[in-house]
């Protein structure tokens, strides 16, 4: 017969015992628990194991009970401490709430007092304004104000009257002086005009008599129909020399120099008048006058 040796299991600290070994061990333990001799150095006392085992069990039970009681006491202490902490926290919260309530009540009281003070100030201002208006609306103040205005206006009117009188006198003097100066100037101008009239009567009026508007109109009509041999054409403008008053006179007198001016129909008449006046003034002074031809331009 081959015997099978069982290997001990892994991770086991105790050695593996066979079934017979286990039975023997249990029997030995039981015998030891029934009768056990205990020797003591001083006095040898033999005591049965049963009583000692019971005492040990009781002691163990008592110790366990004491431990449980201690644990219960500790738990109770912990609970009481937690309750105390909770109570303390509640007390702190209550104190904070009371403080905030006190602060809020103080603020509301101060606001109410400020509002009351403002209302009192406003009432005082209203009373003062009412008193002022009553004083202004009283008949005595109105009468006094009207009297003062009347006296001020009368004083101002007197001063203005004095100033107006002075200004009128100054204006009269200035007018008289101006009239005298104008009379002197008029006399001088009359004398000069009389001398000029005498000179003009001696001079010939042939130049003014030669200017006729009808001839100018006829010439304008001719310009639209034909161009004479003295004129010339341009791409943009049509210049005609025969339509000029001064040009026609110079053809008769054989001038030394001729000045040509080109103008629109609306400006041509004004230019001719100005040039005639200028030429007459130059002739009166004894100066030589150059002839000018004013030509019409057609756009």
Curated annotation (Swiss-Prot):
Q: Where is the composition biased (Acidic residues)?
A: 150-169, 177-212
Q: Where is this region: Disordered?
A: 1-30, 54-89, 148-212
Q: Which GO terms describe its molecular function?
A: histone acetyltransferase activity
Q: Which domain of life is it from?
A: Eukaryota
Skewed-composition ranges (Polar residues): 1-10
Start-end of Low complexity biased regions: 56-89
Q: What is this protein called?
A: Uncharacterized protein DDB_G0284311
